[in-house]
Regions:
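Pocket-lining segment of extracytoplasmic ligand-binding domains
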Residues: 1-44, 49
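Periplasmic-binding protein-like
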Residues: 61-97
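Short amphipathic alpha-helical coupling segments at ligand-binding clamshell hinges
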Residues: 52-60
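Second-shell loop/turn segments in exported
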Residues: 42-48, 98-107
């Protein structure tokens, strides 16, 4: 268990960490939620990758129906958001949310990703 003061000290010293909560009963004999720190998942690309491409990929990660992955009865069917697919595919995938997308971000955002997050109000 890490108290809030220690978590703040760790995150301030090592900005690639973010505060997270492990829900009760995640592990055997763990009947209470536990606050701790973790390294969050980050999507990384080279700086020279096209801005519009990275903007589009970032948008597809968060917005359902933005892209088409499959056909149903011969017609294109809009796919769920990439984050929604991750939530179905992996237990930690449900923790990938737009609200926490920038938590623990210790490297500069690509201009395309920055544009998307600015549009969504995550960056002022």
């Amino acid at each position: 268990y890490l108290d809030d003061a220690l978590i703040k000290k760790i995150v301030d010293t090592y900005p690639f960490y973010a505060k997270v909560m492990i829900p009760a009963n995640t592990y055997a004999n763990q009947d209470k939620s536990v606050n701790t720190v973790a390294v969050m998942a980050q999507w990384v690309c080279a700086a020279e990758v096209d801005e519009e491409l990275i903007y589009t990929l970032t948008k597809a990660l968060w917005e359902p129906g933005f892209h088409v992955l499959r056909k149903k009865e011969g017609k294109p069917e809009p796919a769920p958001a990439g984050a929604e697919i991750m939530a179905q595919a992996h237990a930690k995938g449900k923790d990938v949310t737009l609200d926490t997308a920038l938590a623990g971000m210790a490297i500069p955002l690509h201009p395309g990703a920055e544009r998307y997050y600015r549009e969504k109000g995550l960056i002022k």
